[in-house]
Amino acid sequence: MVDELGSNSEVGTLKVVILHRPGTELRRLTPRNTDQLLFDGLPWVSRAQEEHDQFAELLRSRGVEVLLLSELLTEALHSGAARMQGVAAAVDSRRLGIPLAQELSAYLRGLDPVRLSHVLTAGMTFNELPADARTDVSLVVRMHHDADFVIEPLPNLLFTRDSSIWIGPRFVIPSLAMRARVREASLTDIIYAHHPRFTGIRRAYESRTAPVEGGDVLLLAPGVVAVGVGERTTPAGAEALARSLFDDDLAHTVLAVPIAQRRAQMHLDTVCTMVDVDKVVMYANVVDELTAFTIERQPDGVTISDAAPFVEAAARAMGIEKLQVIGTGIDPVVAEREQWDDGNNTLALAPGVVVAYERNAQTNARLEAAGIEVLTIGGSELGTGRGGPRCMSCPVARDPLP
């Protein structure tokens, strides 16, 4: 099983992917907490589930094995060590106080794997605390409203791209930047450490300090990795990842790509994704301004070159004459709307074959005009968290590119 897993590109034929079907965690969203939980609206959950099921079925119809995060987590939680790890990550004694934290931890450790998996993903309100956890000595319990969260939900689990990254035959457990998402990495950590499917797989990098998120990491070609630096991934995170990849011989060149620190461009893959071995789709407004610092491995360390145009730096690192840009060079208003709706956030199933949201009609038409096969899915509800097909998928295995 170990030899089947791994990826060295964005476009090698996709074999295995991790998705998360949206569930109760989305039903926890209210007008009061959407900003805190990083959603731009209240999704119609049953419709979001239908759209996600369509996405998963499309992948299966193309021969992709779809692994669901909640099922992997439930299976991993049969391990006692996994249960301890999950409970420790979910129960914050600094926020809950020692008495409640102790009572809650004991209760959670007694849950069966299915129920514990549900709580770790969907969270728990004070109203859902069992009677024997409502200790009379807990001021925290007495002062909180019943609908407040004792364990916060993880609605952004939908975007499995960010909480783990496969580079070569190894995986990365990153540190997520936003408080609402920090605990997601603990769940992927549990899965990779305790699920038998991943026995023997080695980590490439792990950071609990400098943030790196999977949406900022593009595998441009074997040995060449681009890392967006902006709202989520920091320069320190990008540099630490680069040095780790060099040490493990997983890359020879890393491009650090500054992006605007704004919600619409939170990750590099919101403005640019690979659609073929030498083609990218890119938001028109950044084509001329996107740059990259080239970090290269050397026998005695690394060298960091001055910023150069991203497309030129990428082509040079990839060893190709030109990286073709399929721009959303349409009406500026339409281009901005479709970028906001994740028009540039495509998932490649094979060279020249991508999945995209159907609503981004003009971007999709430009891709098709450039010879790309575009497979569309609905995304009216899935998109309320600002993520597209690439964001919603963590490729675990692709056919390697030479």
Swiss-Prot record:
Subcellular location: Cytoplasm
Keyword Hydrolase: yes
Domain of life according to the entry: Bacteria
Keywords: Arginine metabolism, Cytoplasm, Hydrolase
GO cellular component, one term: cytoplasm
Gene3D superfamilies referenced in this protein's UniProt entry, alphabetically: Arginine deiminase, L-arginine/glycine Amidinotransferase, Chain A
Recorded catalytic activity of this chain's protein: L-arginine + H2O = L-citrulline + NH4(+)
Name listed for the protein in its UniProt record: Arginine deiminase
